[in-house]
């Protein structure tokens, strides 16, 4: 794992050390740059495999091809002997060394041959061509910015902000979508001119030409050809694939830990790891002090302890309190470099885990694969539609946004309202549903969220918040062979008779008791709604005070004030709190990045 940064073309070579210095949290063990005519590629390294010999960037035999990556290539053990058999000379045990040699054999098709979580950069000097690529699921981030005759790239936005002359201009369209989704959807970023490379895409750059961005892999949710009427056979196949996926994620020369929330996803990952790991595993649970125990989190802790005892793990419990959230918010926002109002509990658990391990395995991706959210239950007809939620699936999905387009427009100042005329997050949702491969209602919503919410929100918070503490997180549910198999299953195996994640629960029943499996989902969430409505009220009101909103003039202060009042009025609901929280986080972000 590492952070990468650099440029292709006529870039400023002196900017690269400054770019990399902002990424030391992603790679505190080493920093190295390789540069030449029309390129510079640098990497900060978190040493996990071949600790002594795996320094990046790496080259082919004659140094003509240079490559670096952020991530892990899980098919490295099978690819390495193939390259050796073809006459390539590999001098380390690191997976990154595959890249320059594989480029020599397959060129721009390189991403199709590697499997794992990665963001990579390759420069071929003789051919004068550069390649950027991002993994299939979107686990690892990669941003790029065109300036003059150069294409700059980096693992995080902060590295691009370090380039001399970078202009920090707010992307109003990205802001508009953020207020609906709680995150900025790719390929947008909050800064004008900067793009995020989408998951499963590559970018090919030749000096003097426009970069070419193309998809190299697509996940199909179309029904598979094999019969799925034999439920035990489906469970057998799923567990076999999951067992292999967990095994691949144990590849490391340093200690590994496991997230263990007490829910099915992380518990099953832990159970499978206990079967295949060569030694006793470490598990970690986040708990909440005080009032949080009244909203179900005590059940999470109880079941996490049960799993830890059942599989004899080296178990650790870490506790956070209400005051930890506002005091850490600016550090959290610096991890994202963008406003982000999604889950941030990973920050606190990763902070504690990093004191014990360098690598962690988590259960993220299971909700989006098997169906767990309100939108999934609505699609299955497992929950009656609330008033006004009838219509096409994309339409009622749009109604689940934190703020509608109309609500946002009501808050905007006249200038912003005019600048955003014609921009619609509702239309953004509709367009996402237009290109789906799935036909049954559950899989249609799962596919839409797989393309959007998973990489833009779930995997974003997992990566940024863990890597801010130099902790690499791996996800067994996001293994390619697991994902492709589950995507091919009908929605009726994912949500059945109102039960979410049906086939996953049936699989977990081979390991856990019924009362654990069938209990209500809590999720890896902080009790932020209760905190905002309770002890955080002074902080919310102070952050959204008129004098602070005047720093940018984007919103009408009286209308924002009225929204805040509704949060603290009798009968306030989760959605109302989320609207105010999205504004609070944007305000904090603005003051940090654009307020001077």
PLM feature segments, named:
Residues 1-4, 85, 162, 171, ...:
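Adenosyl-5′-phosphate
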Residues 1-335, 509-510, 515, 553, ...:
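Cysteine-centered catalytic environments shared across enzyme families
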Residues 357-367, 371-373:
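Short acidic/histidine-rich active-site segments
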Residues 138, 370-395:
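A mobile, often basic/glycine-rich helix-loop segment
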Residues 330-334, 375-378, 531-533:
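Short low-complexity, flexible loop/linker segments enriched in glycine and/or proline
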Residues 344:
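Divalent-cation
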Residues 236-257, 352-356, 360, 453, ...:
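Phosphate/ATP-binding catalytic cores across multiple sugar-kinase/actin-like superfamilies
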